[in-house]
Amino acid sequence: DLGAKLALNLRAGDCISLIGDLGAGKTTLSRGLIQALMGADTEVPSPTYTIVQTYETDPAPIWHFDLYRIESPNELIELGFEDAEDDIMVIEWPENAGSLLPSQRLIVELIFTDNGRSARLTGTTPEWKQRLNDIFDRS
């Protein structure tokens, strides 16, 4: 499970941006990631209407954002978006964050294919690229 693999390698200050069409699996991936750290019984609702849900995990709290309904990045300031940067951020619809989106992040693009779905992972820093190599070399 991709979410679980990523979860076990997260650190405070990490940002994961999830890109994909409606129904591509962004919330499902987020749920798998959070449940890998908190237990399979943990309820992980989509934050579509609340915009953000937080979870106390080790190594750091996770802020799960769904920015689908955000009309302006300024709305994020009121929600504590910048406060989350020292913790772990998982962001659905990251394009709606504008310039507030951290530049150092892991981009996970979920794509519909003839056989279901696939994921393209891109690290924006050398550290993320190395971590991805480590994660998938062990798999």
Language model feature labels by segment:
Residues 1-5:
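N-terminal pre-Walker A segment at the start of P-loop NTPase domains
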Residues 7-13:
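Phosphate-binding P-loop
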Residues 16-18:
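Hydrophobic anchor at the beta1->P-loop junction of P-loop NTPases
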Residues 22:
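The conserved Walker
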Residues 26:
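Conserved lysine of the Walker
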Residues 40-55:
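Short beta-strand-centered segment that lines the nucleotide-binding/catalytic pocket of NTP-utilizing
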Residues 72, 79-139:
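Short phosphate-coordinating micro-motif centered on Lys-Gly-acidic
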